[in-house]
């Protein structure tokens, strides 16, 4: 089981704080450091000092780490043009010596688009944009060196793209998709995804989504083991009830609710819950660390949860 640290910097974090978390992620033996890709905070938090750009952050971390994998969970397709995004991620793959993964989604947070003047079309059009971006990015990365890439879609047209730089990873960095796996998203996942993520859902619901993805993978003629499955869950781990109550209060969450809808409890309880997800096929868990200053919790997970998995 791979444990990955997942941060939400839009809720309030500086680059320096994220660098500290990434270094701890590497030093403590976790598999990866991921971050969200948002420009606006959510809920009753100030979000200060303000948003940080996901891919600039990861570029910095690529030069400050040597082992952990790096990526977004997930980047909205509405934020960037697919050609420049393919270039950025390929460059970051070189900067990190092949440690980058691209999480991509259709985009959902209308308020952040309005706040920063980013167009936010209806859901059907966002899915069209999302699908075309996957085609373009995958096509640019897979085009043989020395050949050009062309694409004519409803939203993007590329003519004679040189399709460089090439990523270090061959044929391309892993692509992570996620969501409820409705018919269209399941088909896109079966065509493009290396990993499917279901975030913040109970075990049974997670498994039901995975069943739909497995069926789509089979219909696409792919090998069953060519798709990795993952979950993202808010984490709240402590050795005793007092510590759990303190961490839950810091999150502004009810502890009983966290036990139901997250990874909350003692190390043994959290290891057992991760085991339940493992039974659904999950082989990597994104631990949503809402407080980037709480490195003690990461140390506890590394020392007392990881060995039980």
Protein language model annotation of sequence segments:
Residues 1-309:
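Active-site-adjacent structural elements that line small-molecule/cofactor binding pockets in enzymes
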